[in-house]
Curated annotation (Swiss-Prot):
UniProt region (A), positions on chain: 1-341
Protein name as catalogued: Chaperone protein HtpG
GO molecular function per UniProt: ATP binding; ATP hydrolysis activity; ATP-dependent protein folding chaperone; unfolded protein binding
Region (Disordered), start-end ranges: 490-509
Pfam families attached to this UniProt entry: HATPase_c_3 (PF13589), HSP90 (PF00183)
PROSITE patterns in the record: HSP90
Species of provenance: Clostridium botulinum (strain Hall / ATCC 3502 / NCTC 13319 / Type A)
UniProt xrefs under NCBIfam families: PRK05218.1
Length: 626
């Protein structure tokens, strides 16, 4: 019997494939089962084109048999089988695809597809076996042949006996090594788990004889083992069922079975698309944040199937980061696969699916916001932060997609509102969308800077997330209304008369303010009369793009560079404290220095900033109490 050489590449290529392409050895079973499914598909196709043939589904199945004692694993099918020439052409050439050739030779009709890439996928058998035998009898032939190979050195083909058409793959499982436990691929539980994981939705039954126990007939207290045939796979995935046949409970059960979360989904999306690219998808929006969601360990992505065969557990390319909380599956027959499903080529079809999914999620969230506000607010409590990161990231390129999904707490409504709702009720004379930043709504309400805006009757949005102001700086405006912090130097709300009065106050007290600025030794950019304060004596305002709150966030990051916002100390000249300042300036410069330091540190504390010298601050308080 002649040993033939592989026609494609030498041992180096086969070694490269085994060691590099396949990252998980268990996928060998997925590949071989997929090839068996292809073989049955070909029989089905023949029945579509030959009226003399009848496809009786019960006669077509895949069987997996484990023989632990002899270290043999068999995968058999009742598919179309292979002739001697097909064995040589399909198995003698690495990466030769019999399924692909079959597609080329036959017009593929609607509803019919072949998932396999025969060749490299088949050779994944060598991941777990160093002796692979294929026994096959082609449909309509009286002859059967046995193909055998022990690795890259070559293969043999010889006639053999086989009663029925179909193919049987016999793997001699490798012995264990220090690095690998090959015994597991002979265990019923492991084989069943691999089938459920990768091949649960193959449309033909995958059968195994499973070990069961039952009480002995002569002694009910003792048990004996017996074998019982079971179909392991579900065959019909939920996403291929008619949506009208499914209930919310069915989706919730699927969510739980897939271990997407311990909660119930707040929203599920079942979509089927036919067009340039065709796919089925079920997407879930969770109710609560996964415990690791905001950690580097969290991995976004959807399960990706090709015709019911799992390709990737988490395909991150299907979701933008800002929708990374979405769970679910996508199944398509249009994906381009590079080298037997293990490496997915990020091609045009995948990008089209990702684009469609992004739009679908956005539309569903907008619908949830409009029709089920309570549910949306619950979702936003968990994942609003992620949407705001989406606005900020990638230089704001996604802001138009996400801006209508944002919500903030409102000073007027005392609840969460959208930007559209805020703008819709702005008075005609209001130029800006005003916001205030703080650690909590309660602290923001007590900010001195907010008094002037509220006194004008304007609504203020409360920013309590550290990402909020960064996102809004990237957004810049909404419906042609710019955003303005209540701590900004110019609020844009004063009338001409008040503007002139304020400028007059600065001129009148110029020397006092310059003296206070000098006493603060560069800690503030300026000291001036406040246009915004009503009841408080002092506050800090900021000049420029970097706000005081942004300074706090940036300096809290690892390896901070001690970034400082340009601060302005604003004095309420209508407050009694200002009279004390004027008296000290005119008669006691040392007391003026004491008052200036106290007011500056008071303003820092109101902003939640650390004071430079707490001991000096408390000593100064004691001085004025004497």
């Amino acid at each position: 019997m002649e040993t033939k050489q592989f026609k494609a590449e030498s041992k180096r290529l086969l070694d490269l494939m085994i060691n590099s392409i396949y990252t998980h050895k268990e996928i060998f079973l997925r590949e071989l089962i997929s090839n068996s499914s292809d073989a049955i598909d070909k029989i089905y196709y023949k029945t579509l084109t030959d009226d003399s043939l009848k496809f009786e589904r019960d006669n077509y199945y895949i069987r997996v048999v484990s023989d632990k004692e002899n270290r043999i694993l068999k995968i058999a099918d009742t598919g179309i089988g292979m002739t001697k020439e097909e064995l040589e052409n399909n198995l003698g050439v690495i990466a030769k695809s019999g399924s692909l050739q079959f597609k080329k030779e036959n017009e593929v009709k609607e509803g019919y597809d072949i998932i396999g890439q025969f060749g490299v996928g088949f050779y994944s058998a060598f991941l777990v076996s160093d002796d692979v035998t294929v026994i096959s009898k082609a449909f309509g032939s009286n002859e059967a042949y046995k193909w055998n190979s022990k690795g890259a050195e070559g293969y043999t083909i010889e006639p053999c006996e086989k009663e029925t058409y179909g193919t049987e793959i016999i793997l001699k499982i490798k012995d264990n090594t220090e690095e690998e436990n090959y015994d597991e691929f002979l265990e019923e539980y492991t084989l069943k788990s691999i089938i459920k994981k990768y091949s649960d939705f193959i449309r033909y039954p995958i059968k195994m004889d499973l070990t069961k126990t039952k009480p002995k007939e002569d002694n009910k207290e003792e048990f004996e083992e017996y074998k019982e045939e079971e179909t392991i796979n579900s065959m019909v995935p939920i996403w291929r069922k008619n949506k009208n046949e499914l209930k919310a409970e069915d989706y919730e059960n699927f969510y739980a079975e897939k271990h997407y979360g311990f909660d119930k989904p707040i929203k599920y999306i079942h979509t089927s698309v036919d067009g340039v690219v065709s796919y089925n998808a079920i997407l879930f929006i969770p109710e609560t944040t996964p415990y690791d969601f905001y950690t580097k360990e969290y991995e976004k992505g959807l399960e990706l199937y090709s015709s019911g065969v799992l390709i990737m557990n988490k395909c991150g390319d299907l979701l933008p980061d800002y929708f990374g909380f979405v769970k679910g599956i996508v199944d398509s027959e249009d994906l381009s696969l590079n080298i037997s499903r293990e490496i997915l080529q990020h091609d045009r079809q995948l990008k089209l699916i990702a684009k469609n999914i992004k739009t679908k999620i956005k539309n569903e969230l907008e619908s949830l916001l409009k029709k089920e506000r309570d549910k949306y607010e619950k979702f936003y409590e968990s994942f609003g932060r992620q949407l705001k990161y989406g606005v900020y990231s990638d230089f704001g390129s996604n802001k138009d997609i996400l801006q209508d999904l944002l919500m903030f707490y409102s000073s007027k409504e005392k609840k969460m509102v959208t930007l559209a709702e805020y703008v819709s009720r702005m008075p005609e004379d209001q130029k800006y969308i005003y916001y205030a930043v703080g650690e909590s709504n309660e602290r923001i309400e007590k900010l001195p800077q907010i008094e002037g805006v509220l006194d004008k009757g304007y609504e203020v949005l409360y920013f309590t997330d550290d990402i909020d102001e960064f996102a809004i700086k990237m957004l810049m405006s909404y419906k042609e209304k710019e955003f303005k912090s209540v701590s900004s130097g110019d609020l844009g709300i004063e009338g001409e008369e008040k503007e002139n009065t304020s400028n007059s106050d600065d001129k009148e007290n110029k020397e006092l303010f310059e003296s206070m600025k000098d006493m603060l030794s560069g800690k503030v950019k300026d000291v001036r009369a406040s246009k915004r304060l009503k009841n408080h004596p002092v506050c800090l305002a900021n000049e420029g793009e970097l706000s005081i709150e942004m300074e706090k966030v940036l300096n809290a990051m690892p390896n901070n560079q001690n970034i400082k916002a340009d601060k302005v100390l604003e004095i309420n000249i209508n407050h009694d404290v200002f009279k004390s300042l004027k008296e000290a300036y005119e008669g006691d410069k040392e007391k003026l220095k004491l008052y200036t330091d106290l007011l500056y540190n008071q303003a820092l504390l109101i902003e939640g900033l650390a004071i430079n010298d707490p001991v000096e601050f408390t000593n100064n308080i004691c001085k004025i109490m004497k």
